[in-house]
């Protein structure tokens, strides 16, 4: 029996890829999960795997705050080292979050190899600093490979949940009609700015027969400002795979998790990078999709959402019946997104883990 410790914490972008890998492991592997109290993993993980938590955070704020956080990091590392020895852990997999640093340092101290997966095109601070201490570093986007000092990253892609890889029906609650389906994914971070941009351009689209599903995120207070029979607004959906597979076009942030899901579904996308993302990594993620021809980038600061409106009208023009529209745009973008996709990313990471045992 192989004992694996998965260190993944915080957002869905860290957790869902790790869960996808865990589900792809051989049956004789035993998984222990390392996270942080009061984060998303405390809701998603315990039903499937044994969850252990330690207090960990980023080194941010004033000098005093950073000093306190550094002490907490060292204490967390000691706790993780004890866990590794007590549970006789043989391998560690980290997909990021605050827990990554103490997990990598503790594994190094205990002589246990770590696989670190970096999802974004611009690696985070932990990856840049600690990647050299890992047995292997994997990347989700090729642009990250040359930005991790002291390591030779392997391109594995970004694991997604199994239901994204299987054909799904269009959700029954999607508005009926012959018009194109536009899916907007607001996301949990920075959703307000994107949601306002989208609402500014919806009325003329709806009047032309465009069907719209707007996933606003949980913190949106402006739901209901635009009302129309062809518009559905809700915070979140468990049926995102079916939505993306049947969408003619999506509008989304450019987080690595969302981008990988859009790619495996082959969904033509307008990407609006979150402008406050660390190191502008969403801008770099979006550029990877645009280079493949699968996405168009629109920036949030564009005045009055004019560029967003023009872009949607251009891409959906043929489906909306505009006589001068180019019918090849969406099929070409769909092919571009499919080129970006790596559908066996979970198995590639499993193979990488197994290689460290040989």
Curated annotation (Swiss-Prot):
For this UniProt record, give its keywords in alphabetical order, as a comma-separated list: Cell cycle, Cell division, Cell inner membrane, Cell membrane, Cell shape, Cell wall biogenesis/degradation, Glycosyltransferase, Membrane, Peptidoglycan synthesis, Transferase
Pathway where it operates? Cell wall biogenesis; peptidoglycan biosynthesis
According to the record, the signal peptide region is: none
Q: Where in the cell is it found?
A: Cell inner membrane
**Could you say which residues bind UDP-N-acetyl-alpha-D-glucosamine here?**
11-13, 120, 161, 188, 282
The UniProt record lists the EC number as 2.4.1.227
Enzyme superclass (EC): transferase
Predominant cellular place of this UniProt entry's protein: membrane
Q: How does it sit in the membrane?
A: Peripheral membrane protein
What reactions does this protein catalyze? Answer: di-trans,octa-cis-undecaprenyl diphospho-N-acetyl-alpha-D-muramoyl-L-alanyl-D-glutamyl-meso-2,6-diaminopimeloyl-D-alanyl-D-alanine + UDP-N-acetyl-alpha-D-glucosamine = di-trans,octa-cis-undecaprenyl diphospho-[N-acetyl-alpha-D-glucosaminyl-(1->4)]-N-acetyl-alpha-D-muramoyl-L-alanyl-D-glutamyl-meso-2,6-diaminopimeloyl-D-alanyl-D-alanine + UDP + H(+)
Q: Which GO terms describe its cellular component?
A: plasma membrane
Top-level division of the source organism's lineage: Bacteria
Supply the InterPro entries for this chain.
GlcNAc_MurG, Glyco_trans_28_C, GlycoTrans_28_N
Q: Which GO terms describe its molecular function?
A: UDP-N-acetyl-D-glucosamine:N-acetylmuramoyl-L-alanyl-D-glutamyl-meso-2,6-diaminopimelyl-D-alanyl-D-alanine-diphosphoundecaprenol 4-beta-N-acetylglucosaminlytransferase activity; undecaprenyldiphospho-muramoylpentapeptide beta-N-acetylglucosaminyltransferase activity
* CDD domains named in the record: GT28_MurG
Q: Name one Pfam family in it.
A: Glyco_tran_28_C
The biological processes this protein is annotated with in GO are:
carbohydrate metabolic process; cell division; cell wall organization; lipid glycosylation; peptidoglycan biosynthetic process; regulation of cell shape
Record's family? Belongs to the glycosyltransferase 28 family. MurG subfamily.
Role summary: Cell wall formation. Catalyzes the transfer of a GlcNAc subunit on undecaprenyl-pyrophosphoryl-MurNAc-pentapeptide (lipid intermediate I) to form undecaprenyl-pyrophosphoryl-MurNAc-(pentapeptide)GlcNAc (lipid intermediate II).
Q: What is this protein called?
A: UDP-N-acetylglucosamine--N-acetylmuramyl-(pentapeptide) pyrophosphoryl-undecaprenol N-acetylglucosamine transferase
């Amino acid at each position: 029996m192989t004992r694996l410790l998965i260190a993944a914490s915080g957002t869905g972008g860290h957790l869902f890829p790790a869960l996808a890998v865990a589900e792809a492991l051989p049956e004789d592997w035993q998984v222990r999960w390392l996270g942080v109290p009061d984060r998303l993993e405390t809701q998603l993980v315990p039903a499937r795997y044994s969850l252990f938590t330690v207090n960990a955070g980023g080194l941010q704020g004033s000098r005093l705050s950073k000093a306190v956080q550094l002490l907490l990091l060292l204490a967390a590392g000691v706790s993780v080292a004890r866990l590794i020895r007590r549970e006789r852990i043989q391998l560690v997999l980290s997909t990021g979050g605050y827990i990554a640093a103490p997990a990598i340092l503790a594994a190094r101290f205990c002589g246990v190899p770590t696989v670190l997966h970096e999802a974004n095109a611009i690696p985070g601070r932990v990856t840049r600093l600690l990647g050299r201490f890992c047995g292997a570093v994997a990347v989700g986007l090729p642009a990250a490979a040359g930005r991790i000092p002291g390591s030779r990253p392997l391109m594995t892609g970004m694991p997604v949940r199994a239901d994204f890889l299987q054909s799904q029906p269009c959700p029954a609650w999607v508005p009926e009609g012959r018009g194109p389906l536009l899916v907007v994914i607001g996301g949990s971070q920075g959703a307000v700015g994107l949601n306002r941009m989208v609402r500014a351009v919806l009325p003329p689209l709806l009047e032309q027969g465009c069907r719209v599903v707007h996933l606003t995120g949980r913190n949106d207070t402006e739901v209901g400002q635009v009302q129309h029979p062809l518009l559905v607004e809700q915070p979140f959906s468990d049926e995102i795979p079916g939505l993306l597979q049947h969408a003619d076009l999506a509008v989304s942030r450019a987080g690595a998790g969302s981008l990988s899901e859009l790619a495996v579904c082959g969904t033509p996308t307008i990407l609006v990078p979150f402008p406050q993302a660390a190191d502008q990594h969403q801008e770099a993620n979006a550029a990877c999709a645009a280079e493949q021809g699968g996405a168009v980038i629109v920036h949030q600061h564009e005045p009055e959402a004019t560029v967003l409106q023009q872009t949607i009208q251009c891409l959906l023009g043929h489906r909306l019946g505009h006589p001068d529209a180019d019918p090849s745009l969406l099929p070409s973008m769909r092919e571009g997104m499919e080129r970006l996709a790596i559908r066996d990313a979970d198995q590639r990471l499993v193979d990488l883990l197994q290689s460290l045992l040989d």
